[in-house]
Every structure is written in structure tokens, then in C-alpha cells.
Amino acid sequence: MERNSNKIVSSDNESLILVDKEDNEIGHLSKVECHKNEGVLHRAFSIFLFNDKGHLLIQKRSSQKKLWPLYWSNTCCSHPREGEDILDAAMRRLEDELGINGIHLEYLYKFSYQASYKDIGSENEMCSVFIGSINGDVIFNKNEIESIRFIDCESLEQEMHLNSDYTPWFKMEWRAIKEKHSMELEKYIKAFL
């Protein structure tokens, strides 16, 4: 699993989509402003990709990230840009971060959450969660990702229980997937539940 180029795929000044509690678009604001203090509710997505062994691809966030640097997180998470469909944004980001394209993503659910990181800033997101499968090589972007690995679900459960170096949204999403979307999850992991 080689590192991809050092292509810059986002900036603090990019315009994110502000939403209300029903995910209706209500405006736009720069990424840096959306993440200040308690954060401003904005649209986001998270992706969970499994290989043919039922192992989840997870990433360690870059040391350059302002929020939760060097924490383990799900396969990919980001924001659609102004005027961009959420599924198009998810596919764009998979290619930009991991060199993955041409796969099918299944929509699971949407939820909102707020989480603060030290006194640096917060996520305050209306997040759509997708699941899918991956076969083939993954080439990650070193500006976005420190490292990647595949992990089986049982090991992930143990690590999340013992270690605090997992992003809060990853923990929330994983719990919801197991508890409320086990039928969909079973298609991808086959053996573990």
C-alpha cells in the first residue's frame, strides 16, 4: 500500500454547506469557520469499505489535521462542496484520498453530532453514512492520511474499547451500524456479528 502523490485535496477556505436539523441547505461557510469553537452544523459524509475477507479499511489521520490528528478513523470522511451532490463528493474524496474509484456505495443512514477536540475546535455535522466493498490496491494521499490498514471487526471492537485514539464520529457510526444496520453490515463482513 504505497503513498499517493502529495496532491492537495482540500483547504481551510473551501466553502461547506450549512444545514438545519432536517438537512435543508441554509447557506455556506468556509471550512475553518465551520470548525471553530462549538462548530456550525454542516453537511458531511462517512464511508466504510470492507475487503473480501470482511476486514474494514481504516485510516490514521495525518499529523497535519487540526482536529484529531493521528487518530484512527473510518475509511474516508469529508464534506461535499458547495453545489456538489453528497454521493459525488464521497466518490471524489475516495479517489483523492485513497486512489479508489468505480465502486458502489450503499447509503445506510444520516445523523447529526457535535464533538469538540481539546480547545482547538469542533465537528458539528449532519453526516450521511455509506458502506461498500473494495478489492485491489489502495494508494493513499500522504497529505490527508498518515497510514492505513485493514482490521477485522473483532479486533476493531477490542481496540475501540481499550484505546482512545479513535475519532468520536467513527465510534458513534460503528456502534449505530452494528446496532441498527446489522443486516447490511453482514453482507460485507459475513462471519462476525
Give, region by region, the residue ranges found by the protein language model.
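Acidic, metal-coordinating catalytic segment for phosphate/diphosphate chemistry
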Residues: 2-46, 50-52
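Short, Lys/Arg-enriched, disordered terminal segments
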Residues: 1-12, 183-193
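Nudix hydrolase/Nudix homology domain
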Residues: 33, 82, 109-114, 121-193
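A glycine-rich, hydrophobic loop/mini-helix early in the fold
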Residues: 44-77
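A short, polar/proline- and glycine-enriched secondary-structure boundary/capping micro-motif
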Residues: 37-39, 67-72, 149-152
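Short glycine-enriched loop/turn motifs at secondary-structure junctions
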Residues: 10, 73-74, 140-144
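The catalytic Nudix box helix
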Residues: 57-58, 75-108, 130
